[in-house]
Amino acid sequence: MTEPLNVIEIYPKIFVYKGLFKDIENTYSLLKESQGKEDGLFSPWTQWSRFGEYINPIFKTYNDNLKIEHVEKVKTSTEKQEEHKQVLLEILNNFMIATKDYIAKNNVDFDENKIVPNVKDQNGNPIKEWEYTGPSIARYRIDIEDPLAMTYHTDYIREPIVTPGHKFAITALTYFNDDYEGGEIDFIANGDAYMYKPEAGDLLVFPSGHPDFLMSENSIYLHGVMPVNHNSKYLSRMYWTKYSAGAPEWFENEEKFGKEKWQEMQQEIMKKFRDENPNRNNADKERRIK
């Protein structure tokens, strides 16, 4: 008989899953000691924007979006390689356990096997409506002096014209340690602000800010991250994404400018959009719940 999940809804549609990892301290130790040079599978740590470092790709010589079925087939020849393989499998399997429960409890219209009609990828293969991505394993710098390590944002990428493709819908963050100061995640939704300090082994699932899913009344969910001190914060980021057909205006502009030219124009268009619609850097106007 399967044991019931230890899950806490800390705020509407924000769930914390606890106790999923067999030995979170060992997982943390393996990640912390990994330099990408030993006889393991993990790649070296490389720069992650201005926030810190991440392991990219996860495994040496493999792409950065390994599915469970791919990881299960990875051959290992050393004890360290097998340990790294099991770490990744546990992260992936726990993601599935938590997010499938979250999807059911929040009545998300979800079919993992549904195919997008009349659309193929660049190789002519069918496209699934829902795809998961990750994990991206990262660690935050300890010398960020700004009030926020990451400003309030949605993982869903805001666009002036919706492009065709998969969009972030559900975010799942796994936390491997809590031996640091700070590092809280702060949510803004529907005029409320709610701050949570993750504990080692927590798997936090919440809306990515997609305007068609998991709203708080008429409000999307924003989240920001506080800086850490003394020790880095180690975490994994994973997502469920849902395919969008794209706005009619997108295809009208493809016809007008040509596909290649219209694609080349996106960098400047997106920069202008971000400059005119910056992320928030405080929650001063919200009602503080916690």
Regions found by a protein language model. Give the residues of each.
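Metzincin-family zinc-dependent endopeptidase catalytic domain
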Residues: P135, L148-A149
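Histidine-centered catalytic micro-motifs
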Residues: A149-I157
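Structured loops at beta-to-helix junctions and adjacent beta-edge loops in soluble globular domains
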Residues: G19-L20, A138-Y140, D155, Y175, ...
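Non-heme Fe(II)/2-oxoglutarate
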Residues: T2-N123, I127-E129, S136, D143, ...
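Short, conserved beta-strand element in jelly-roll/cupin
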Residues: R139-I142, P160-E181
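Beta-strand elements of modular eukaryotic interaction domains
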Residues: P4-N6, G124-I127, I161-P164, F176, ...
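Short, Φ-rich (hydrophobic/aromatic) sequence segments
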Residues: T27-E33, L92-F95, A169-D179, R237-W240, ...
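Catalytic core of Fe(II)/2-oxoglutarate
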Residues: H166-F168, E181-K290
